[in-house]
Structures are given as C-alpha cells and as structure tokens.
Amino acid sequence: MADYHNNYKKNDELEFVRTGYGKDMVKVLHIQRDGKYHSIKEVATSVQLTLSSKKDYLHGDNSDIIPTDTIKNTVHVLAKFKGIKSIEAFGVNICEYFLSSFNHVIRAQVYVEEIPWKRLEKNGVKHVHAFIHTPTGTHFCEVEQLRSGPPVIHSGTKDLKVLKTTQSGFEGFIKDQFTTLPEVKDRCFATQVYCKWRYHQCRDVDFEATWGTIRDLVLEKFAGPYDKGEYSPSVQKTLYDIQVLSLSRVPEIEDMEISLPNIHYFNIDMSKMGLINKEEVLLPLDNPYGKITGTVKRKLSSRL
C-alpha cells in the first residue's frame, strides 16, 4: 500500500462527473402484527451514497467509507424500527438516516421494489395471515436527496403485461424498398408496461393509493370500455393517451415516462395443411420487438 501511495500522480486532465457506491438488492420481509391480523411488505432495496471527498478513488484511502455491509444492516434495522408503510416512505427514511448520521454523505439515492403479494380473499372475506403472489405489475420507487435539498421521489409500475385481441391497428406508415410489413386494421396488441412518474411535492401524499390509481388508469386507457373496448391506431397514441389521462386525474405528479414494447403475435399460416387460420391460432414472438417510449411533463404555465 505504501508503494502505491508513493507512485501516485494526480491527473490534471481528468475530473469526476459523479461517484457513488452502496449495496444492491437488500431484501426484507416486514411483518406487521395487529393481533391475529398480519400485514406484509416484501421489498428489494438498493442504496447509493456519494461522499464529499474522493480520496477513496484518488488515494485508496478508505477512512471515509461506510462499508456496504453496514448499509445492508442499516436497511434491516430501519425496517424494524420504522416499518414499511409504503416503499416511498421507506426510501425517504433511508436517505434521511444516512444524510443526518454522516456529515460527509452529500447525496443518497435509494431504489425500492415491492414484491407483489396480495391477501387471500374468498367471498369478500379476507384471510388474516395468508397471501398469494400476484405478478400483475410491480411497484417501485426511486428516492434521491442531496444534503442541501428535499427528497425527490419517483414512483412507477413495471412488468404489467397486458393484451387485447382486437381494437388495434397500424396503417399509413412510410414504405420504402425494405418495407415488408403490411398495413393492418385489426390486430392483437400486447405490451409490458413500464411507467414512472415524479411527485412535485411529497407532503401528505398517499403513495399507495396514487400508485393504484395510476395503474388502474393505464389499464382503463389500454383496454377501453368493458363492453366495446377502445381503438388504438398505434402504440404511440395509446402511450400518450395514458399520460394525458394520468396527469389530468392525478394532480400530485409532475411528469410521466412510459416505455411500451410491442410484443408481436403473428397468425400461423396453415395453408400448406389445407387449413384456413382466421386469426385463431397465433405465434408469440419474444424478439425482436418494437419499443415505443415517451416522457411528458406539465408546462410551467399550467402550474401557475
């Protein structure tokens, strides 16, 4: 180590853009027991800290480093003493702990993902302590806080896989010498929704209810009315319609990012077997797939 220090030479042509270190995928199952009625939150948490000095990078000096094993243990202890009311509140608790406990921590960033457990229910009666894994959209959040500022909270849903068998088409696109895709007025539309939004303020927000509301709005706009659906001329239009509906219904959010892969299902040609397949048997293709993204935010004038 001494030889390393003696051979160190500063490079004046380089500067740090951003640094961080931490612990990823710290898993916790928190059980809240109210008599025989139990509630659970299972989460996977990742923590990144930025320190005021760079001597660990520049000199191999570890004297300012909070070990990542300590970070893991801190997440466990905060779950015990603070509980997990919502993953957003848990993320804020973690940021605030490290910023208040260590003066040389200048930035804390926390990602929390909730494992989707749902309480068992039958005929309107909820089970007191049994749950079923229901992967119908994963709730996640990102919390970032600088020493000089309030926490910035993003929430989102991912892995929300949806499909409709009609009321979707794709026409009027550019055709050149490499185009083989035919226009279609009626097709299957399947996607796996990734949707993330930012809260413009964090006080008195019911994060759980807001997440549920936005998830329901995504499904509402994708599917349309239950008796007839709603036509989608493109994935892009559906994506934008989800954003417009969400920001109009949920005043707590400032912007929204959505990514929608276009998961393809193609009609299987059975003509060589003397059969006519009228879009009854389709072939799912995992890849390649189209990917449509978009982010919108409120204009400044709309907030005045």
Curated annotation (Swiss-Prot):
Query: Enzyme group, top EC level?
Result: oxidoreductase
**N6-succinyllysine-modified residues are where?**
K10, K23, K221, K228
Residue span of the signal peptide, if any? none
Looking up Pfam families in the UniProt record yields: Uricase
Using the record's annotations, give every residue carrying the modification N-acetylalanine: A2
- Give residues annotated as binding urate: T68, D69, F170, R187, V235, Q236, N262
User: What are the BP-aspect GO terms?
Assistant: purine nucleobase catabolic process; urate catabolic process
**Quick one: which pathway?**
Purine metabolism; urate degradation; (S)-allantoin from urate: step 1/3
Q: Which family does it belong to?
A: Belongs to the uricase family.
- Report which superkingdom the organism of origin falls in: Eukaryota
What does the UniProt keyword field contain? Acetylation, Oxidoreductase, Peroxisome, Phosphoprotein, Purine metabolism
What catalytic activity is recorded?
urate + O2 + H2O = 5-hydroxyisourate + H2O2
Summarize the protein's role.
Answer: Catalyzes the oxidation of uric acid to 5-hydroxyisourate, which is further processed to form (S)-allantoin.
Which species does this protein come from? Macaca mulatta (Rhesus macaque)
Quote the cellular component terms of the Gene Ontology held in the record. Answer: peroxisome
Q: Which Gene Ontology molecular-function terms are recorded?
A: urate oxidase activity
Sites of the modification Phosphoserine?
S39, S63, S232
Q: Where is motif Microbody targeting signal found? A: 302-304
Q: Which InterPro entries does the entry link to?
A: Uricase, Uricase_CS
Its subcellular locations are: Peroxisome
Q: Which residues carry this modification: Phosphotyrosine?
A: Y289
Question: What Enzyme Commission number(s) appear in the record?
Answer: 1.7.3.3
The catalytic residues are K23, T68, H264
Q: What is this protein called?
A: Uricase
Q: Which residues carry this modification: N6-acetyllysine?
A: K10, K23, K27, K36, K118, K122, K164, K175, K185, K221, K228, K278
